[in-house]
């Protein structure tokens, strides 16, 4: 499973990139708004750092508007992926982008049927939202398993991005259940490194080394 980072913060992206684990970035209008910067300028900055997929979301609600927005976003860099909502109009846009060779990420996926529809429209990625399903008492991780099984049975190449990741357990379980990618907030990404026994082991090795000097 690959790691994307879910942020529009440049310092977070730079740090994750320096760690050597970053395969891509996902953004959305809310994340960009927090940064108080030009959307297009920030995308240029991100794509100058990250060579993998960088998801940029359209805000139009009709297919024609999404296509117009997406075509402009795709001009920023060849690794821009157009993030499109899981709606009938969104899937019309996905089909058009697919025919033009523009990558797409269908977001706000909450059912296996939605994921299958998006894949058949030509989506490069689908993003089921784990945390938001958990919030309403549904099993987001089970959804990952179901989508992965359906895609495997039918030979579908669309990749599954586990999104709305809230904690490290989501990451582990998404990997076990067949997600191709986890897009992870910076805070959760850094939590993946931590275990008290790792810290204790380092301290012991250093103490032992210093004693023998």
Curated annotation (Swiss-Prot):
Transmembrane segments: none annotated. Its EC number is 2.2.1.2. The active site is at 83 (schiff-base intermediate with substrate). Belongs to the transaldolase family. Type 3B subfamily. GO terms for biological process: carbohydrate metabolic process; pentose-phosphate shunt. Transaldolase is important for the balance of metabolites in the pentose-phosphate pathway. Keywords: Cytoplasm, Pentose shunt, Schiff base, Transferase. It catalyses: D-sedoheptulose 7-phosphate + D-glyceraldehyde 3-phosphate = D-erythrose 4-phosphate + beta-D-fructose 6-phosphate. It holds the Pfam family TAL_FSA. GO terms for molecular function: aldehyde-lyase activity; transaldolase activity. Its main location: cytoplasm. PROSITE patterns: TRANSALDOLASE_1, TRANSALDOLASE_2. One of its GO terms (cellular component) is cytoplasm. Pathway: Carbohydrate degradation; pentose phosphate pathway; D-glyceraldehyde 3-phosphate and beta-D-fructose 6-phosphate from D-ribose 5-phosphate and D-xylulose 5-phosphate (non-oxidative stage): step 2/3. NCBIfam families: fsa_talC_mipB. It comes from Geobacillus kaustophilus (strain HTA426). This is Probable transaldolase. HAMAP family: Transaldolase_3b. It is found in: Cytoplasm.
């Amino acid at each position: 499973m690959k790691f994307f980072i879910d942020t529009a913060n440049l310092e977070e992206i730079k740090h994750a990139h320096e760690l050597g684990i970053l395969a891509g970035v996902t953004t959305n209008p809310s994340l960009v708004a927090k940064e108080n910067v030009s959307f297009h300028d920030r995308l240029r900055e991100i794509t100058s750092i990250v060579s993998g997929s960088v998801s940029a979301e359209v805000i139009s609600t009709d297919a024609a508007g999404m296509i117009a927005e997406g075509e402009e976003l795709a001009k920023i860099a060849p690794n821009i992926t157009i993030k499109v909502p899981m709606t009938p109009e969104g899937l019309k846009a996905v089909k058009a982008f697919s025919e033009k060779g523009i990558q797409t990420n269908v977001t706000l996926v909450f059912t296996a049927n939605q994921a299958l529809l998006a894949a058949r429209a030509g989506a490069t990625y689908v993003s089921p939202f784990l945390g938001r399903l958990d919030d309403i008492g549904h099993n987001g991780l089970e959804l990952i398993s179901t989508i992965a099984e359906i895609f495997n049975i039918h030979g579908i190449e669309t990749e599954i991005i586990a999104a709305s990741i809230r904690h490290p357990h989501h990451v582990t379980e998404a990997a076990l259940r067949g997600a191709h990618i986890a897009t992870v907030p910076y805070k959760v990404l850094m939590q993946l490194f931590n275990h008290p026994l790792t810290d204790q082991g380092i301290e012991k090795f250093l103490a032992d080394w210093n004693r023998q000097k």
